Regions:
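A structural signal for multi-pass alpha-helical bundles of membrane permease subunits
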Residues: 27-295
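Short, Lys/Arg-rich, polar N-terminal cytosolic tail immediately upstream
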Residues: 1-23
């Protein structure tokens, strides 16, 4: 009696990779095409930016787009951005402003969110309603009174003036409250029985469990204020306090626009944010799924 044994050979990695893109139905095929189209629409501006940063100004808006420039001036463009101007100072200013804002936002938002989520007091629901309503107020509405106050106290062109309007983040309070509400009340009650103060409960119990939410908000906050141009354009009056985003305007004037260096500057400004997101993406995605922000 002969027994035939068939041995299944594992698929090569390349075949498995290609098989993952094989649509199972027409709907899957259409969905895959739409996803590829959406991904390309998101990626193409960065491709354009990187390509333009290596071209001379007259080639940036050539009608025949090609990624690799006919005349390569990428080295000159990036050298001019990094060394002809104190660009490292601009980057340092942006880091100082973003980190300073983030620290104060966390210090103010975490206790406020904990109080709204776990402490029972009269008017808490109404207070939370005001918090949600405050999300609809843009900074443009409050910029004039804040600016006049900074002028009166002589605080223009300082790190404080760049950070002050953003010290309290209503979005952070809302995000952390949604996250804290899911934390078990029984653990908090047990901690109180053991003699924990409310601050100790926040620092030793709540905050370690909220690391994904903190990471997600940190990405939101740092990216938003790193890219901010509106407020620095109002309060910065010297090159010493100029941020990286604001410094890109130096390559544009009424009579001349150095587009090559402008795009090189934009690439240098964008790179740190891409790196931060790549390192924090898992915590970012986890916080979206665990908090109240769901599609």
């Amino acid at each position: 009696m002969t027994v035939t044994t068939s041995i299944q050979r594992p698929q090569a990695p390349r075949l498995r990779f290609l098989a993952s893109f094989k649509p199972k139905s027409l709907a899957d095929a259409v969905g895959t095409c739409l996803l590829f189209l959406g991904a390309w629409l998101v990626i193409f501006p960065f491709v354009w930016m990187l390509s333009s940063s290596m071209k001379p100004a007259d080639e940036v808006y050539d009608s025949n787009f090609h990624f690799w420039p006919e005349t390569f001036v990428g080295g000159a463009n990036y050298y001019g951005v990094l060394f002809d101007q104190p660009y490292l100072t601009f980057l340092a200013n942006s880091f100082i402003v973003c980190i300073g804002i983030l620290i104060v936002q966390l210090v103010t938002a975490v206790p406020a969110a904990y109080a709204l989520a776990k402490l029972k007091f009269r008017g808490s629901t109404i207070l939370f309603g005001f918090v949600v309503a405050s999300l609809t107020i843009p900074i443009n509405v409050t910029s004039i009174p804040i600016y006049l106050g900074l002028v009166k106290f002589g605080l223009l062109d300082t790190y404080f003036s760049l950070m002050f309007p953003f010290f309290v983040s209503v979005f952070a309070i809302f995000l952390f409250r949604q996250f804290f509400k899911d934390y078990p009340d029984s653990i908090i009650d047990a901690a109180r029985v053991d003699g924990f103060s409310e601050i100790e409960i926040i620092l030793r119990l709540i905050l370690p469990a909220a690391i994904p939410a903190v990471a997600a908000f940190s990405v939101f906050s740092v990216v938003a204020h790193w890219n901010d141009l509106y407020w620095p354009l109002i309060v910065v009056q010297s090159q010493d306090k100029m941020t990286a985003a604001l410094s890109m305007l130096q390559y544009q004037s009424e009579f001349d626009n150095d587009y090559g260096r402008t795009f090189a500057s934009a690439t240098v400004v964008t790179l740190p944010m891409v790196v931060i997101f790549l390192f924090a993406r898992r915590l970012f995605i986890r916080s979206i799924t665990m908090s109240g922000i769901k599609g």
